[in-house]
UniProtKB/Swiss-Prot annotation:
Keywords for the protein's UniProt record, in alphabetical order: DNA-directed RNA polymerase, Nucleotidyltransferase, Nucleus, Phosphoprotein, Transcription, Transferase
Sites of Phosphoserine modification: 1025
Protein activity control: Antisense ribosomal siRNAs silence rRNA expression during the elongation phase by decreasing rpoa-2 occupancy downstream of the RNAi-targeted region in nrde-2-dependent manner.
Protein encoded by which gene: rpoa-2
GO biological process: DNA-templated transcription
Role this protein plays: DNA-dependent RNA polymerase catalyzes the transcription of DNA into RNA using the four ribonucleoside triphosphates as substrates. Second largest core component of RNA polymerase I which synthesizes ribosomal RNA precursors. Proposed to contribute to the polymerase catalytic activity and forms the polymerase active center together with the largest subunit. Pol I is composed of mobile elements and RPA2 is part of the core element with the central large cleft and probably a clamp element that moves to open and close the cleft. Specifically binds to 18S, 5.8S and 26S rDNA, but not to 5S rDNA.
Pfam families in the cross-refs: RNA_pol_Rpa2_4 (PF06883), RNA_pol_Rpb2_1 (PF04563), RNA_pol_Rpb2_2 (PF04561), RNA_pol_Rpb2_3 (PF04565), RNA_pol_Rpb2_6 (PF00562), RNA_pol_Rpb2_7 (PF04560)
InterPro entries: DNA-dir_RNA_pol_su2, DNA-dir_RNAP_su2_dom, DNA-dir_RNAP_su2_hyb_sf, RNA_pol_bsu_CS, RNA_pol_bsu_protrusion, RNA_pol_Rpb2_2, RNA_pol_Rpb2_2_sf, RNA_pol_Rpb2_3
Name of the protein described by the UniProt record: DNA-directed RNA polymerase I subunit RPA2 homolog
Family membership: Belongs to the RNA polymerase beta chain family.
GO CC annotation: mitochondrion; nucleolus; RNA polymerase I complex
Amino acid sequence: MDCDIASYHVDSFDFLVSKGCQFAAQAVPAEKFRLKNGDAVTMKFTSAQLHKPTLDTGAKLTSDTLPLLPAECRQRGLTYAGNLKVGIDVHVNGSRLDIIEIILGKVPIMLRSEGCHLRGMSRKELVVAGEEPIEKGGYFIVNGSEKVIRLLIANRRNFPIAIIRKTFKEKGKLFSEFGVMMRSVKENHTAVMMTLHYLDTGTMQLALQFRREIFYVPLMYIVKALTDKNDAVISAGFKRGRNQDQFYSSCILNMLAQCQEEEILNQEAAIRAIGSRFRVAVSDRVAPWEDDLEAGRFIIRECVLIHLDSDEEKFHTLAYMTQKLIALVKGECAPETPDNPQFQEASVSGHILLLILRERMENIIGMVRRKLEYMSSRKDFILTSAAILKALGNHTGGEITRGMAYFLATGNLVTRVGLALQQESGFSVIAERINQLRFVSHFRAIHRGAFFMEMRTTDVRKLRPEAWGFICPVHTPDGAPCGLLNHVTASCRIVTDLSDNSNVPSLLAELGMYTHKTVALAPPGEELYPVLMNGRFLGYVPITKAASIERYLRCAKVAKDARIPYTSEIALVRRSTDIKNIQTQYPGIYILSDAGRLIRPVRNLAMDAVEHIGTFEQVYLSVVLDPEEAEPGVTMHQELHPSCLFSFAGNLIPFPDHNQSPRNVYQCQMGKQTMGTAVHAWHSRADNKMYRLQFPQQPMLKLEAYEKYEMDEYPLGTNACVAVISYTGYDMEDAMTINKASYQRGFAHGTVIKVERINLVTERERKTIFYRNPREEIKTVGPDGLPIPGRRYFLDEVYYVTFNMETGDFRTHKFHYAEPAYCGLVRIVEQGEGDSGAKHALIQWRIERNPIIGDKFASRHGQKGINSFLWPVESLPFSETGMVPDIIFNPHGFPSRMTIGMMIESMAGKAAATHGENYDASPFVFNEDNTAINHFGELLTKAGYNYYGNETFYSGVDGRQMEMQIFFGIVYYQRLRHMIADKFQVRATGPIDPITHQPVKGRKKGGGIRFGEMERDAIIAHGTSFVLQDRLLNCSDRDVAYACRRCGSLLSVLMSSRAGSHLLKKKRKDDEPLDYTETQRCRTCDKDDQVFLLQVPRVFRYLTAELAAMNVKIKLGIEHPSKVTGS
């Protein structure tokens, strides 16, 4: 498949294997603690290496270790994971004790990555290994299931975003709605959020995040902790570029004065003040023998602009953020929003796993610390390598193995620190293989986050102009996730590796940039633009040179100059010169080359070469579709293809530019629900349920993307002759009629393939194997006790037999599917080491699914319909040439849907069939001067057909010619997986709920159909109220109960005898006989003359009892029976 559908997933995991594991080991803070005997111990990871998956035979890793392939994991239900080997450096009292190397656990391996055995295999080798010939990888195998981590949208890293947010006022007293937010990210992808808040007093507070807690620190505390310079130098550094702004100058002086009042006079005092306030929060990260100075340094290092290494760089970047915040407060720059793709990036699977791995390693070393502290309480304890290995134990390895597998299996993130991600669930999903389009779309999906699903605002769902070329405008669900679950375009890719930008500062200095040390040499009064590179404030450039510097950098980037990464973004944001003072972004030159950015290729017209641009710089570029639209001196870029705005699925819609937009949205969803050829390696898969179209065809109309993606290897539909005519009456309301003869010849014939996993190892009788009693003949079971391949099985037929080797008993198991099924492949797989006999079987069932009434079909234009009738061929209309349509389509489906693309496809399909060619249906090929209708109409004329695709038809009933011409052509139809056999629900009798006495819900339980308010209203509107009473009461949960008319209670009536009541209430004469007749008596009123038998629903009695338990009484208004009957 000539499309990098999952390249960024694989590249990100390659980063994890090659560099990430080592980064994670180095990023884990050293554990410093003191044992009971007084020894000071320091433990730290020094190295980490990820190995390829191997068979777990208990042997050490050697060159002879057997490799574990993905196909084996799918069938055996295993996790495709490799061993993580780490080195732990241990120091005692400042002297090195040892460097311990140990396998810490297993980490799931992404297919086709550097850690996978499939890497580098040819197509033939992939087929031999049980994989698809075009396998691209990008997913994991966990417990036999394929899992993919979806792309997650995050704030752009290392970029200060100016925000106006009303909720900022709720942060504390005197807080305003203005702030500058930055998501600071290290090279190892460790991230922290920090926000600079503006207070109504003119001062500023810096919000720091540590382990999900937010701490507010005065800005100047942090600034003075970063530098040992005096207040005058600090003030000059912060005011550089805004010396004439008296308001800003007063703000800086006020904050410095506050520091004087708090006696924060130098760098050490500032660090100590910060350390004393954070000492409790970082107690497990600072050794007991270290003072507040070390705690303060830890906060500066791990919570403040962590992507910068030196304090001087942090000082200058904070100065930039302060100036940007003041510009926002004064209305000099436009506010920004994290909902804009310009300020977003994608968190890729490898980077997310790296963060989880780092935290798991941090948890392990903390567990070892606590174990050693416990072990040191014994008198004879001596800290040795053996003691550390014992402390590591088996439970620490499960932290990695089980933790990583749990994350991928459930998609839930269990974390203490939060990892600067806005959600804790929904990270991974099952990579469903309903068809190839569905499978591929998982890798191209990009999600905003589960947190935003609950928000009422629609801002996060909007399709913004900045998303052009990066986010597909039509490939998004039409339900609740609309606008939140998007898909990147086919040409979009994501930067996953770290770019070398170390030469950029020197290059900028050569081009005329003033560094912070040389800016004092700038001529007085010269206007300057700040230069920011990946959140690092490099210096200033004169406004007069800014444009020429930006052009030079772009030329160097396109020419792939080694000094600047070719995937970097270069943007010049100019000051607003508009007369109406329309605000722009904060001006400056921005160079962005971090990982996680979305980039796409365009053509640079000046250099006639392909250039990759990003979401930030695209806003300030002029990109045209047609060279004739180029504006001299302004336009420098052109799109490579007009369809660059569509995703993988969007590029497979024929003539999408002729359809209404919602129809393209529907097709993107329905294309992923189509029965087709999902895989070719059926023999090596163990999916619970898969769909297969038995006789698929390639479409008569193809797109450029169709050939590029090799979709003919996995076709999705059938070419059908479609007549647009109101003929049968069964084609109303989106229904369609199928030719019964076409159905009988296999039109849209499909099968459902299920794999049943029978694992005897999990049963209580571990001595059980598959085996049939040789003395007993069972025709439905083979000698090995397993079903016979190729045989058709029906409900309650015996399909496998087990034998208990301890008791000698045979046990038969009956077929439990309601539909008959053919037994396909029967496989015996190993469960693990030491298996004795056949215990784990995979049985493949093939269920035939011919199109029947109620099955769903759709064209490639979002025109979905239900098969309403299989019409006999002798009664269908036929053309002059004897052609009988396969499908009757109602003409009323066109006007409201405006799917002109389907009409063009009908004409073009007929022309393609008559000329024996495949025609191009790519978008934007035709225009107003060269229309598609005219092009294909002329082709039809050459073939002897009507220009508009109309034909003369004859009635199939009486053979008379129809007065009107019928629009007739070939359309590629898809059969969707929504089949009536999976959904129909009808019953006469069945199980009922023991409490409500109503039918249980659920199709699998044999429950009743759902009946709601709309159905009730429909029956009332038909004037059939008695049917309503009969169905919903008499035949559902009708019940009888006694109620007291006097007090209206349904619960106070109890059965009692007159004799007992007489003895309690009054004295009885000696000769008076006892009356033992039982009667219904109201316990509240103590009378029985107003107790009547009522007919009520059982669920009403249950509701009354439930409300009574909550001390709520229901009082009924009951008429006397004489009034009801009229007597």
